[in-house]
Regions:
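Gram-negative bacterial Sec-dependent N-terminal signal peptides
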Residues: 1-21
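Pepsin/retropepsin-fold aspartyl endopeptidases
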Residues: 22-626
Length: 626
């Protein structure tokens, strides 16, 4: 195997615009690169712009960046096709597409732009403005037809394709784009190989990576205006979507609009109507998603994707979820109302050496105990919650004892001298001291001890505000900022070692969880545990049976005409170059695919920067693949 030790050379300062870098830095998941080899590095989600369409110039559309997708697709409506060619002028839409496909096959013509242009097909379609609901009419020439294999029918699906410029991270690429309906997906745009090739790499561990240099720092509480109505904002790190207070919500599905009333703290109401983006299914029923115009200050208005609900019983009118936070902000966990200040940029905040954390961390205490950690907007003194603790005295001095699992998986009793005690409500928390590994730094910090809550089962750590001398900033774009991994280039296809087997796999930034081909799946129980036996095999003759504990199940939403799919999830050891991890893998029959495994975000997040078009960057291509 080739050596995996890429030190990425960057141009510029960390938090300036990506195009303006001039310093040389080593890049990690904690301090990421935004470009490499004069190509962008994109997160798994990015803002995409139709800047050549005047009505949509400067309007961001959410795009999913997927190295597993050969083509780029956009959501389009009212798609109609006509032709001025004498042989096809009486046909339209899907009939016209099939006639072109069949004619090209019969005449053995090449599948290229010149061939498709010769059929003189014009495509008319609309893209809906997400803020106004206006249908933007577009006409273009058919330049390609994508043939998509259907999982529910023997007959493939045909999608017309046009060439359009799309802009991400300040770079515009004229890409071949499929027109389709993507209303069932959270992202109206899917960015695939036709955009990424020779233009961008993908870092699956981040969302909105290209937006990070422009992020604003906001407080844990803010006040904004929506259509002249003051709304208080709080932050919810556990929720993906933001939600906003609204009453008298009425959805007009035919007009694709939502009418509702804003309501301030005094109960005064103001009517508003916005385009319906889509319906979101929540635990409390269906909720309409809209782009809410949010005025941050006198000079700046943003549009936040929120679902509408009654929040009259809550102290804030907007709950800010991870998606909107990642697109625009970094949160100061201890401050409030920072939007009123002149300069709230992330770039400026970094100068004071804050502790930057993510919603999900693992910290190491005293070099032997790895504990899940989470941010807090309330706790000042860092807090370790344990199953139980005991106070005692030794030589007249008070000490506290508690049990943690060490790096060898052994339960070990820890005893520390009590420095002081904190009274919080009815509980009294002893305060002790420990050595913490925070990224590449070791710090001796005080922390409090308390019992787990009733619903908690395992010890965890709460990252209080006093963990840093300046401030603790929350960056929701990624995870594990305190356990950084070096960035490395990886091909779309690489040879990985899975347990004792080595074979080529596909690196797919669009997949949340990795997946492996599994036959003869048999689930059973043993000693109270859910177990599974399955056979791995691929099309070059490798075959091996595995037995694993089932650690989870994945429920795949069925398409029309399909049965719901439930896949057992197991843990397997996977190695790519120097990256060696035990990850969760779902079991599915991938027999119809050449590549018997895909590595998704849960492996790639450890520093992989993936190409969509280059293969075998780290590893050698096997002879049987040549």
């Amino acid at each position: 195997m080739k050596k995996l030790s890429l030190i990425l050379t960057l141009t510029g300062a960390l938090m300036t615009a990506p195009q303006a870098w001039s310093e040389t830095l080593s890049a990690t998941t904690q301090n990421p690169a935004y470009q490499v080899d004069n190509e962008l590095i994109l997160g798994r989600i990015e803002n995409v712009y139709y800047n050549d369409i005047p009505e949509l110039k400067g309007v961001p559309f959410m795009g999913k960046i997927d190295t597993g997708a050969d083509t780029t697709s956009i959501h389009a409506e009212n798609i109609h096709l006509t032709s001025t060619h004498p042989d096809f002028k009486d046909l339209t839409d899907n009939d016209l597409l099939w006639a072109v496909v069949n004619d090209r096959r019969e005449n053995k013509l090449k599948r290229n732009t010149e061939t498709y242009l010769s059929y003189q097909v014009t495509i008319a379609f609309t893209i809906r403005h997400p803020y106004t609901g206006e249908d933007i009419n577009i006409k273009d020439d058919l330049e390609r037809i994508s043939i998509i294999r259907s999982r529910t029918s023997k007959k493939p699906i045909l999608r017309p394709a046009v060439r359009m410029p799309l802009t991400i991270g300040g770079r515009t690429v004229e890409a071949m784009i499929n027109l389709t309906k993507r209303s069932q997906f959270s992202s109206p745009i899917l960015i695939g190989k036709t955009f990424l090739e020779d233009n961008a790499w993908v870092m699956a561990g981040y969302d909105y990576l290209q937006e990070q240099p422009h992020a604003q720092v906001i407080g844990k509480k803010e006040t904004v205006e929506v259509n002249g109505v003051p709304y208080k904002v709080s932050v919810a790190t556990t929720s993906r979507y933001s939600n906003a207070h609204a009453v008298d919500v009425k959805i007009d599905k035919e007009a694709q609009s939502v009418s509702f009333k804003l309501e301030d703290e005094k109960g005064e109401r103001k009517a508003m109507t916005l385009p319906l983006i889509r319906i979101l299914n929540t635990s409390n029923g269906e909720r309409p998603l809209v782009y809410l115009p949010v005025k941050l200050n006198q000079n700046h208005t943003q549009h936040w994707l929120v679902y509408l609900r009654d929040r009259s019983h809550l102290s804030s009118q907007i709950s800010l979820g991870r998606d909107v936070a990642s697109e625009h902000f970094v949160i100061d966990t201890d401050s409030e109302n920072l939007l009123k200040k002149a300069d709230t940029s992330f770039k400026t905040a970094l100068k004071s050496d804050p502790l930057v954390i993510s919603p999900k961390e693992t910290i190491t205490i005293d070099q032997e105990f790895s504990i899940p950690a989470q941010p807090s907007f309330i706790v000042k003194t860092p807090l370790l919650r344990v199953k139980e603790f005991d106070l005692s005295k030794k030589s007249g001095k008070e000490q506290v004892s508690f049990t943690l699992e060490n790096s060898q998986g052994e339960m070990k009793t820890v005893t520390k001298p009590v420095l002081r005690k904190l009274k919080v409500g009815k509980s009294v928390r002893p305060v002790v001291e420990g050595v913490f590994e925070l990224g590449d730094k070791k710090r001796e910090l005080e922390f409090a001890i308390d019992n787990l809550g009733k619903s908690d089962t395992k010890p965890f750590f709460v990252m209080g505000h006093s963990m840093a001398k300046s401030s603790v900033l929350l960056n929701t774009r990624t995870e594990d900022l305190l356990s950084p991994s070096p960035l490395f280039k990886a091909g779309h296809i690489e040879v990985v070692q899975v347990e004792d087997l080595a074979f080529p796999v596909k690196l797919d930034t669009g997949a949340d969880v990795s997946s492996i081909n599994a036959k003869n799946i048999k689930q059973y129980q043993k000693d109270g545990k859910d177990m599974v036996t399955f056979t791995y095999e691929n099309d070059v003759g490798m075959k091996q049976e595995f037995t694993r504990e089932v650690v989870d199940v994945m429920r795949i939403t069925a398409k029309k005409g399909e049965k719901a799919n439930v896949r057992p999830v197991v843990e397997m050891r996977v190695r790519l170059g120097e990256l060696d991890k035990i990850i969760r893998v779902n079991l599915q029959d991938r027999g119809r695919f050449h590549y018997s495994m895909i590595l998704g975000k849960n492996f790639l997040k450890y520093g992989a920067i993936v190409s969509s078009d280059k293969d075998y960057i780290i590893t050698e291509k096997p002879d049987y693949e040549k």
